């Protein structure tokens, strides 16, 4: 490791890797250090929850092989954590000792799981989360012995885990504070389709329910008290959401709120420090937790660091999930659908909900029309008219 790099990137998720790749594409000479806090090559994190049943090799989901980083002249520092930033000296210090100086710094530190108020993170031996590959490995190891599993959360991750664990023959109970499944990305009808699917696969669902307390009993099972029920489970999995990782930015005195505050060029309150991905809070208060949004922000940050100004223009990004071989897709589903004109179509096992604003397609939700998913995403991004949507997709 050198003493100085033109660009130091802290965090090797998709935002960090995309930034490093973009810098190199635009500038062959800039020195780049990519700090990877995990014990493996940077990987596609969204693959983990989809492969709990089958398991996975250490670098199975790697974004690029190790040789790629060498070929690109990107120095990859794995298994190391950044602990402090000295903005005046332009240095980053590491947990393992030592520090480096930077010209420009990118924080792509991502997010971390939220915990119920009754749970403290240091009690992590008592429950499971799935954020990183090691989390999935730990969960899979324990799931081999478990018979009953309680999952707290109604989002995409919770549903994917319920699908995987149920397919392993586990007795799965899914609870959450919301009144429907995946409420941020699915409309009511799509959630009903998903609910019916899970129920047919014997996944127990309890809405508007939360964990009040849990502790290990004499039989080494978890005794869980909820609002309206109680039960004993071999495993408890917490999936109630994530929050931006702010500790490094906070210690450095950068402006933070829900996330690390950035401008339209992804600069923080320090012009030489950028932030991209799950940790960034944009001028409109927007904080994303979508893979492709983080990838896009990484590209923008890379351009800006390389000296090619690029503004964030907030394009919509898709979310997809496959549950028991049923494909769910959402792009830019509105928070308040009452402000939109809505068209719904249902044909056998397929379903579409189209949201129009001033005659223009603004968002959509779809079930089991995978082959046209990319075209649907393009239609939303380009703001197709109702006539173009009907003509292209043959909606009656």
Predicted regions mapped to residue ranges:
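Beta1-alpha1 glycine-rich phosphate/pyrophosphate-binding loop at the start
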Residues: 2-75, 164-185
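Mid-to-C-terminal Rossmann-like scaffold of FAD/NAD(P)H-dependent oxidoreductases
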Residues: 2-5, 12, 25, 279-374
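Short hydrophobic core segments
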Residues: 10, 100-110, 233-241, 298
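Rossmann-like dinucleotide-binding cores of NAD(P)H-dependent redox enzymes
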Residues: 62, 148, 156-213, 312-328
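A conserved short coil-to-beta-strand element within the FAD-binding core of flavoproteins
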Residues: 79-89, 207-219
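Glycine-rich dinucleotide-binding loop and its adjacent helix/turn
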Residues: 109-168
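FAD-site-proximal beta/loop scaffold in flavoenzymes
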Residues: 123-144, 223, 230-300
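C-terminal catalytic lobe of FAD-dependent flavoproteins
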Residues: 222, 233-255, 329-396
């Amino acid at each position: 490791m050198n003493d100085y790099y033109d660009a130091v990137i802290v965090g090797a998720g998709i935002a960090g890797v995309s930034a490093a790749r973009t810098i190199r594409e635009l500038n062959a000479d800039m020195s780049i250090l990519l700090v990877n806090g995990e014990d493996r090559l940077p990987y596609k994190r969204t693959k983990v929850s989809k492969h709990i049943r089958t398991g996975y090799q250490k670098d199975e989901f790697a974004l690029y092989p190790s040789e790629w980083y060498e070929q690109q002249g990107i120095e990859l520092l794995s298994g190391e954590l950044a602990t402090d930033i000295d903005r005046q000296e332009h240095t980053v210090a590491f947990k393992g000792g030592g520090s480096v100086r930077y010209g420009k710094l990118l924080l792509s530190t991502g997010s971390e799981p939220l915990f119920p108020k009754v749970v403290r993170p240091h009690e992590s031996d008592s429950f499971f989360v799935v954020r990183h590959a090691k989390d999935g490995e730990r969960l899979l190891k324990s799931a081999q012995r478990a018979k009953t599993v309680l999952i707290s959360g109604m989002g995409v991750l919770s549903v994917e885990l319920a699908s995987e664990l149920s397919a392993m023959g586990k007795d799965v109970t899914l609870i959450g504070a919301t009144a429907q499944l995946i409420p941020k990305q699915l409309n009511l009808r799509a959630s009903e389709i998903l609910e019916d699917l899970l129920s047919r696969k014997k996944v127990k669902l309890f809405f508007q329910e939360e964990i009040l307390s849990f502790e290990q009993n004499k039989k080494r099972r978890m005794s869980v008290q909820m609002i309206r029920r109680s039960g004993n489970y071999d495993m408890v999995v917490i999936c109630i959401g994530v929050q931006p990782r702010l500790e490094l930015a906070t210690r450095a005195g950068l402006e933070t709120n829900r996330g690390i505050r950035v401008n339209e060029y992804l600069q923080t309150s320090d012009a030489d420090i950028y932030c991209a991905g799950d940790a960034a809070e944009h001028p409109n208060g927007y904080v994303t937790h979508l893979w492709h949004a983080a990838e896009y922000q990484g590209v923008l940050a890379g351009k800006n660091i390389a000296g090619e100004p690029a503004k964030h223009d907030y394009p919509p990004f898709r979310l997809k999930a496959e549950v028991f071989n049923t494909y769910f897709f959402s792009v830019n589903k509105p928070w308040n659908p009452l402000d939109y004109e809505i068209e719904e179509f249902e044909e056998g096992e397929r379903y579409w909900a189209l949201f129009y604003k001033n005659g223009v397609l603004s968002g959509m939700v779809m079930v089991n029309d995978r082959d046209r998913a990319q075209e649907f995403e393009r239609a939303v991004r380009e703001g197709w008219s109702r006539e173009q949507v009907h003509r292209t997709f043959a909606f009656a």
